[in-house]
Amino acid sequence: MEKVYVAGAIPEVGLKLLQEHFEVEMYEGKGLVDKDTLIKGVKDATALISLLSTNVDKDVIDAGKDLKIIANYGAGFNNIDIEYAREKSIDVTNTPKASTNATADLTIGLVLAVARRIVEGDQLSRTTGFDGWAPLFFRGREVSGKTIGIIGLGEIGSAVARRARAFDMDVLYTGPNRKEEKEREIGAKYVDLDTLLKNADFITINAAYNPKMHHLIDTEQFKMMKSTAYLINASRGPIVHEQALVQALKNNEIEGAALDVYEFEPDITDDLKSLNNVVLTPHIGNATFEARDMMSKIVANAAISAVQGEKPQFVVN
């Protein structure tokens, strides 16, 4: 029986599928799998199930001389050297559609949390308490009637747009390509990035990461935004220059931010932790039972297809 190496614990539903077709070796240590352990694990493996936090570089790929597939448990895949994997004739797959609803839900949740100061209010209620209702106390912003600007109208961005429309928000979007059919379906308007930044009350990043997207939102972009704007990032941390974000918040160039991902993840810039107008969550975009189970099944089926000589779903290289 061929071996699959699983770089961390995954939901039981996918693990059971793998056990029906493979000898399964899974990393069960504390924290993330280290490079030496990963290299040892893939040496005699036909398939690797990597996590979004698993760094699959050239050394790891070279060690996996029998690898046919690297099935990444996550929608992103910038943790894998996909070009080198292609050179070695190794398929790399991801789990794109499983994350759509969960990440869109979280994105809108972050919009509401930062605009209505929900987390800040929770902390106040648990610590010092409050004196009671008052007309000027703890005011935030409504989302109804506001404009949301979505960077990246893919599956997740489109799901965010549909939810935003349910809140009676106007929807702007930007990206490398205009999507006229989705515009008609959702009621969204395509604009360039600068126009979006200047006009949106809430800016959500829902685009995939690539090197061209690095620091897409930097000092210059923050200066374009409304002073009452909010930035929400549930995509990839390096799209936003975190130090520039800190300065924009401290200088009141924007009103607030909500982040589920970080430039130096898992580390979080200390200044962000000290600001009351920032909501921080620990990369939980697709952390629902439903999404994680679906992702588990997708990576398992991809690995099974590859060793059976079939083309797996969601190949990215």
Swiss-Prot record:
- Annotated active site residues, numbered on this chain, are R236, E265, H283 (proton donor)
Checking InterPro entries in the record gives: D-2-hydroxyacid_DH (IPR050857), D-isomer_2_OHA_DH_cat_dom (IPR006139), D-isomer_DH_NAD-bd (IPR006140), NAD(P)-bd_dom_sf (IPR036291)
* Family assignment from sequence similarity: Belongs to the D-isomer specific 2-hydroxyacid dehydrogenase family.
> What EC class does the entry list?
oxidoreductase
Q: What is this protein called?
A: Putative 2-hydroxyacid dehydrogenase SAR2389
Name the domain of life: Bacteria
Q: Which UniProt keywords apply?
A: NAD, Oxidoreductase
- What PANTHER family does this protein's entry cite? D-ISOMER SPECIFIC 2-HYDROXYACID DEHYDROGENASE FAMILY PROTEIN (AFU_ORTHOLOGUE AFUA_6G10090)
Which residues are listed for NAD(+) binding in this entry?
Answer: E155, I156, A234, S235, R236, D260, H283, I284, G285, N286
Question: EC number(s) for this protein?
Answer: 1.1.1.-
Report the SUPFAM superfamilies cross-referenced here: Formate/glycerate dehydrogenase catalytic domain-like, NAD(P)-binding Rossmann-fold domains
| One Pfam family, short name | 2-Hacid_dh
Q: Which GO terms describe its molecular function?
A: NAD binding; oxidoreductase activity, acting on the CH-OH group of donors, NAD or NADP as acceptor
Q: Which Gene3D superfamilies match?
A: NAD(P)-binding Rossmann-like Domain
